[in-house]
Amino acid sequence: MVTAHIGKIPDDKMLRVCNEIGDLAFRFGGFFAIETGSEKAIVLKRFIENINSKGLAVNFDPANLISDVNENPVEGLLLLKDYIVQTHIKDCTKVKSDSSSKYIEVAAENGEVDFDIFFKVLDKIGFQGYNMIERNDYFDELDGMSQSINFAKKYIPTQKE
C-alpha cells in the first residue's frame, strides 16, 4: 500500500495520474490510498468514483478532516466507507493564535476526535484494514506516541505472543 496527500482535487492531471497509479497498485495486489483532508469527503468520493480503479482507496485521517476542512469525521467515514483501507489514529485540538483559530496535533484522546464513535462506526461498516498511529508534531514525541499507543490498545486487539 502506498498512501499520499495528492493536493486539492479535482485536477485533470491528478485524475489521470491517480488512475495510472491505482491500476498499477491493483496489478500488484495493493492499493494507492489517498489521505483525507485536502477536501471534503464527498469531493474525494466523487473523484475516486470518477476514476473507477480497483486499486484506488482511502487512507482515512479523522484529524485532517476536522483541522483542514472542518468536517465531521463520522460523516466522512460513512461517505467513504467503501474505499477505506487504512485509518490514522491522530487527534487535533483548536488553539487561538493572534488573529484566528487553528488546530495543532495532539496525542490521540486529547483532542476533538470522538474515538468512541469513530471505532464504533468502523466496526459498523465492517472495516478490516489497518489502523496506524501518525505523528507529525507532538510537543513531546516520545510521550505523545506512548499515549497514542496506550490509547489505541483500548480499541484495537493486540496479537498475543
Q: Residue spans of the language-model regions?
A:
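Gly/Pro-rich active-site loop or hairpin
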Residues: 64-128, 136-142
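Conserved, mostly hydrophobic/aromatic
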Residues: 32, 61, 87, 122, ...
